[in-house]
């Protein structure tokens, strides 16, 4: 039986980047997961239906670390996966990550952030600069 995973996404509010992220999560090749989005404030933008459950937690204006911690405490699961609202996962992300955790008896698995494929030049530069150790 697949272990349950809580994918936690901290964000300021529901926006187009978050909706893209949720759409890509819908393509994951792993069935036993749910998503928790942790927001500063609610939005009038509706979240479409996906094949997975989405929990929404309104946390107010707090930092991303606190948002992640609050989501871990509120919505329990065997495993926790973090992703930013401006990123999207490889479809095998959870499958490979969980297999690695089990086989290697590891506690943490990290992975690359993948930018959206159709970003314009300015968006790509912004994405790369946010992830650079030299900035």
Question: Language model features by range: what are they?
Answer:
Residues 1-24:
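N-proximal low-complexity "stem/linker" segments adjacent to membrane-targeting elements
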Residues 23-32:
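Short, acidic, metal-binding catalytic loop of nucleotide-sugar glycosyltransferases
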Residues 43-50, 92:
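Acidic helix N-cap motif at the loop->helix transition within catalytic regions
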Residues 59-75:
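Glycine-rich, basic loop-to-helix element that forms the pyrophosphate-binding segment
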Residues 80:
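Short aromatic/hydrophobic "clamp" motif used to bind/position activated sugar donors
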Residues 84-88:
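The conserved acidic donor/metal-binding loop of glycosyltransferases
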Residues 92-124:
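Conserved donor NDP-sugar-binding/catalytic core segment of glycosyltransferases
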Residues 111-112, 126-135:
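Short, flexible, basic/aromatic active-site loop/helix in glycosyltransferases
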């Amino acid at each position: 039986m697949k272990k349950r995973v809580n994918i936690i996404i901290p964000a300021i509010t529901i926006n187009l980047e978050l909706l893209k992220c949720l759409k890509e999560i819908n393509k994951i090749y792993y069935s036993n997961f749910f998503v928790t989005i942790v927001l500063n404030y609610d939005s009038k933008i509706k979240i479409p239906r996906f094949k997975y459950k989405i929990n929404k937690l309104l946390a107010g204006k707090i930092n991303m670390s606190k948002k992640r911690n609050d989501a871990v405490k509120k919505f329990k699961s065997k495993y926790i996966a973090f992703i930013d609202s401006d990123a999207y996962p490889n479809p095998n992300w959870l499958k490979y990550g969980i297999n690695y955790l089990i086989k290697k008896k590891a506690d943490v698995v990290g992975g690359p952030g993948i930018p959206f494929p159709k970003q314009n030049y300015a968006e790509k530069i912004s994405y790369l600069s946010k992830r650079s150790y030299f900035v």
